């Protein structure tokens, strides 16, 4: 059972926390990438057409940040967070395009 305020010992293996969704805009993709991941396929529509995805795509680091924000906004650890210790394994298996909608499922 998901509580609104959870401590480390409250997280049980198999627990799934679902988040709300967020639509990713072209403007957000370009703005984030210009500051933090300035690869052509994130910041320039014309150059992106010649890139590996054939169009503009979001930075994986942007999608990671959005996923974390979505989890935090569930309120589960808002009052109990002690910071993040790190990520052992992370893979971006699909590109995120402008106007895609992202939602997250966090599984313990």
Task: List each language-model region with its residue ranges.
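Hydrophobic beta-sheet segments that form the core/acyl-binding groove
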Residues: 83, 88-108
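Hot-dog-fold acyl-thioester-processing enzymes
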Residues: 1-86
């Amino acid at each position: 059972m998901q509580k609104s305020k959870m401590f480390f010992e409250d997280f049980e293996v198999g627990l799934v926390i679902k988040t709300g969704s967020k639509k990713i805009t072209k403007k957000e993709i370009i703005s984030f990438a210009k500051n933090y991941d300035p690869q052509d396929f994130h910041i320039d529509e014309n150059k992106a057409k010649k890139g590996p995805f054939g169009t503009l795509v979001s930075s994986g680091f942007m999608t990671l940040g959005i996923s974390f924000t979505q989890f935090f906004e569930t309120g589960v650890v808002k009052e109990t967070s002690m910071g993040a210790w790190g990520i052992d394994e992370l893979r971006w298996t699909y590109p995120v395009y402008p106007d895609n909608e992202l939602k997250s499922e966090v599984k313990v």
